[in-house]
Amino acid sequence: MKYGKIRIEDGFLVFTRHMMINNLPCKDIVWAYMRKEGTDEGDDRQLSVNYLVIVTRRKKRYKFDMTEKEIHECIRILKILNPDMATGFPKGGRISLQSLPNTRDLGAIVTADDRHILPRRLLRSGELYHISESDKNRLREEYNLKTVIDLRSAEERKCKPDTIMAEVEYYHVPVVDEDVQVISNREQFVKMLAGLPDDIEEYMIRQYRNLCMDQLVLKQYARFIDILFRQEKGAVLWHCGTGKDRTGIGTAFLLSLLGVEEDVIYEDYLRTNRYMEPKLVYMQRLVQTWPEADEKMTEKLPIIYNVKEEYLAAVFETVKKTYGSMEKFFQTVFYLKPKMIEEFRNKYLI
């Protein structure tokens, strides 16, 4: 099968480089994606060119220009020949699932040393209680989901248990196991809103700061990282309730451990606001119809579905003040020496 200047024959990607024919085993390709260069907009009109980018186990990159149709077909065939190959360039974006609004692939997020997280390996999410059959199938088949880490409390899991998927291993790593209020009906929801303080931002900053000073909480995040460290194949998905606070802090620790710069970590953290906006708007309209709910309750709703940069900043500031740096934090709390950190990075970066 020929695609532009390359062809696939007998499990090999065949192409010419420097007047020599190369036979690259398809099994050696770890990542394939489409990249578009140039623009056809504005006064400086340039030809827009599509490229198939191939990354190998030896971290070599090859780029081939071809049509968009050829690229998609080529990636499809490569995926059949090598099911473990990562595809796409999500850059931390949302996975377009029907039933899960805040499930994201951290793949293609760039690190400070210009490496990328491999796509379809690290997935952050909200709860899986209402996951649809089609979404389950997609996570298993397209993302090769092998492990789910539930960061919720035992009571939360009892109220809204994860939907069990075949051939997926489940871990319960409760970051906070007692203080999380479980909401299962309208009366409890109203009571929860009424109980939130008026200085809600300061309250959340204190909550975040307290979380990263609690040794039991940090022990659970260390366990979360340990599970990722031991993962051999397939994708890992971790989640809490809405996928913003406990998941957000854990993801920030993970991205920092992988060498991602803080401004990029904040970008990932704040994406929750975009993906949870429809749910927030719906709940604001709904609560306004409840006679027992007042205006203050409606104003407090964003705290359930939104995050702010100041919350995560409190985590980084507290950790650095307590341990001196993120590196010392990882060594002291997660027991990860520099050699182990590099081993962890080599597992998930390319």
Give the ranges of each region predicted by the language model:
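Ser/Thr-glycine-rich phosphate-binding loops at phosphate-binding pockets of nucleotides
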Residues: 242, 246-247
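Phosphoinositide-binding peripheral membrane targeting modules
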Residues: 5, 9-39
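Cys-dependent protein tyrosine phosphatase-like superfamily
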Residues: 3, 9, 31, 41-237, ...
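A generic structural motif
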Residues: 14-16, 55-57, 241
